[in-house]
Amino acid sequence: MEAEAVRQPVAVSVAATSSTAPARISRRGLTRPTVMVLRAVSLLLFFVLWWGVSLLNAHVFKVFNPILLPAPDEVLRTGMKMAASGELLRHITASLSRVLWGFGIAAALGIVVGTALGRSRLLEHLVEPMLEMLRPIPPLAFLPMMVLWFGIGEASKVAFITYAAFFPIFTTTIEGIKYVDPVLIRAAASLGATERQIFWHVVLPAATPNIITGLRLAFGLSFFVIVAAEFIAADSGLGFLINDARTFFLVSNMLVGAAVIGVIGVLANVLLRKLEGRLLRWRSQARGQA
């Protein structure tokens, strides 16, 4: 009962502070169907422009070799052939397994460490300087060392992704934990909530949007670095597919690999947004009660 008493009033307060986004959307007059149509038109224009430039280069201006800029329909046919042969699925599975392992480890470490440092000033002063020293170093700078330390197998790729994905999650988590509205914490404390109840029912829910943002950034970065890792030491994966196609000037194959990475990134972003909506469903419920 105490937890419920803490959760509902505080949820109403948080909901009130986040109620401006729908208003912004209504002022712009952009409903969900309108947004979907605009996005579809944008994609259509992109493919039409791509097709037009490819066609003009191949048959009119001939600025460079037409093989270097295949038309969208040619890339689509190549992708369908690769999918039918099972080659594309093999590369997708290899990259996804590496990304999910590295991203999962990074998410666990980033959320736990970020939460611990956000809740403890002592730990923050002890640990954060070391992490801040490592954070500006580009992940690619550590790739050769990862290969030397862990070999050319899966361990080096997973460790590389873990390192790259850790910092976005850690940074957004610690910021979300540290900068929770103190009014919410005082409101929960005035209702008799314990420190544990305040953390689970106030601090963590309030920090969840930051954490989800970090997860989205980290997942995109995970695919960025796995492609680089698969350029160097791999016999499968989307990075290997792109690099192997580059060697033989198979531009359509390269674009298929790049397109698949883009599609996976979009799907992951949608799933993480759905997860955020489920985790924060209490906000909309509280807004309705308010």
Give each language-model segment a name.
Residues 1-44, 270-290:
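Transmembrane alpha-helical segments of polytopic membrane transport and secretion proteins
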Residues 159, 163, 195-228, 252, ...:
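Transmembrane alpha-helices
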